[in-house]
Curated annotation (Swiss-Prot):
Function: Catalyzes the formation of N(4)-acetylcytidine (ac(4)C) at the wobble position of elongator tRNA(Met), using acetate and ATP as substrates. First activates an acetate ion to form acetyladenylate (Ac-AMP) and then transfers the acetyl group to tRNA to form ac(4)C34.
Superkingdom classification of source: Bacteria
GO terms for biological process, alphabetical: tRNA modification
Organism (species): Leuconostoc mesenteroides subsp. mesenteroides (strain ATCC 8293 / DSM 20343 / BCRC 11652 / CCM 1803 / JCM 6124 / NCDO 523 / NBRC 100496 / NCIMB 8023 / NCTC 12954 / NRRL B-1118 / 37Y)
Name recorded for this polypeptide: tRNA(Met) cytidine acetate ligase
Signal sequence interval, chain numbering: none
Reactions this protein catalyses: cytidine(34) in elongator tRNA(Met) + acetate + ATP = N(4)-acetylcytidine(34) in elongator tRNA(Met) + AMP + diphosphate
Length: 390
């Protein structure tokens, strides 16, 4: 069977994702669509609106055949690590191609990746008046003439670089994003496709009815099951502030990505009685020219999850394939490839796995449950892959 891979967050699943799946099958003639999907926390360092099982169900009902979890130690990372982890998993699963959205699908990303500068080389990366991403983009443009600005182009280059670095036998097929741009904040009632960020914004404003033209039935059903959604504003900040005010600066300094004195800035700001009173205002108070909003946000999530440097580094060296769900076609594909798969395949998590290989995902799942409204189910131990009959 020929397989095409897609790398996703589905936060939430919308009509643009259906277009992506359809194009992936059409352009490759694949028999099976394999999605590597972020778990309960996404790349920006935020909890997903719906848990990984709800989002898996949405995917299976709309054309995906096999959903594999992108572990927390890859999912909540800068684009190059996110991409590298996703390609590791798809390569282990034997996919022939990956198809992804891009703002500039005409670009030869593999060619650019071959010319791209090695990350963090050069004096310009020691210039603290700009973010790492800005420094990288400037050096890349100087060496390749390619202006790297858009989020999906950044991920596209990450995928291409990962394929080259891993010598993975995977072809890449960029496609134009359908109608909506990543940063679009609004959409009209006439639109059938909107960006995930604009949908999240509409939900945040309580405009549930507004989004029903831009999401499939499976997402509408999940929206009606409000018990499983995140109570972000009231719970996330309270839990995080507790960590920031009770941990010592030394303890905060052990957290992954807590670099260049960020722990002092975090602790000082959190302990200031007249300081920021919300999560968003806290980030604005602590960010600098050196660190993007998203970088600060990810570091705060690592703090909430208490992920230390050595834990993250060890986990990244020991990846696995956690099966979240499949169709009959996906099950057939797994049976066909399971003897050739180069990473551990995990379908059921018991307490021993939760304390070892999957410890970070298990912890992330428990914290997501705490953040969710009443009624959110357990996320890992005893949960079996979902099955959807096509």
């Amino acid at each position: 069977m020929q397989a095409v891979g897609i790398i996703t967050e589905y936060n939430p699943f919308h009509n643009g994702h259906i277009y992506h799946i359809q194009q992936a099958k059409k352009l490759t003639g694949a028999d099976v669509v394999v999605a590597v999907m972020s778990g309960n926390f996404v790349q920006r360092g935020e909890p997903a609106l719906f848990d990984k099982w709800q989002r898996t169900q949405m995917a299976l009902e709309n054309g995906v055949d096999l959903v594999i979890e992108l572990p927390t130690f890859f999912a909540v990372q800068p684009s190059h690590i996110f991409a590298d982890g996703a390609i590791q998993l798809l390569s282990a699963l034997g996919v022939d191609n990956i198809v992804f959205g891009s703002e500039h699908p005409e670009v030869d990303f593999l060619s650019i990746a071959k010319q791209a500068p090695t990350i963090a080389e050069g004096q310009e990366f020691k210039n603290h008046t700009q973010t790492f991403a800005s420094a990288y983009a400037k050096q890349l443009e100087a060496e390749t003439s390619f202006k790297l600005e858009e989020p999906n182009d950044i991920l596209a280059l990450g995928y291409a670089s990962a394929i080259l670095n891993q010598q993975a036998n995977i072809g890449i097929i960029p496609i134009q994003r359908a109608e909506a741009n990543y940063h679009d904040a609004n959409f009209t009632d006439e639109q059938s496709i909107a960006s995930a960020s604009s949908i999240r914004l509409a939900l945040h404003k309580g405009k549930t009815e507004k989004i029903k033209n831009v999401v499939p039935e499976a997402t509408k059903v999940a929206l009606d099951t409000a018990a499983n959604t995140i109570d972000f504003e009231s719970k996330f900040w309270s839990m995080l502030k507790y960590r920031l005010t009770t941990d010592t600066v030394g303890q905060l300094g052990q957290i992954y990505q807590m670099a260049e004195g960020l722990e002092h800035r975090f602790a000082k700001t959190a302990l200031n009685d007249s300081g920021p009173q919300s999560y968003q205002s806290f980030i604005k108070s602590t960010k600098s020219k050196r660190y993007t909003f998203t970088r600060i946000q990810r570091t705060l999530l690592y703090t909430l999850l208490n992920i230390k440097v050595d834990q993250m580094q060890a986990a990244m060296q020991d990846p696995y394939l956690r099966i979240l769900g499949f169709t009959s076609t996906g099950q057939q594909y797994l049976n066909e490839i399971k003897k050739q798969v180069t990473l551990p395949l995990i379908s059921k998590v018991d307490s021993s796995l939760a304390k070892s290989n999957l410890r970070l995902d298990y912890k992330a799942g428990k914290v997501w449950q705490l953040l969710a409204n009443e009624g959110a189910p357990t996320q890992d131990v005893t949960r079996m892959p979902l099955y959807w009959e096509k």
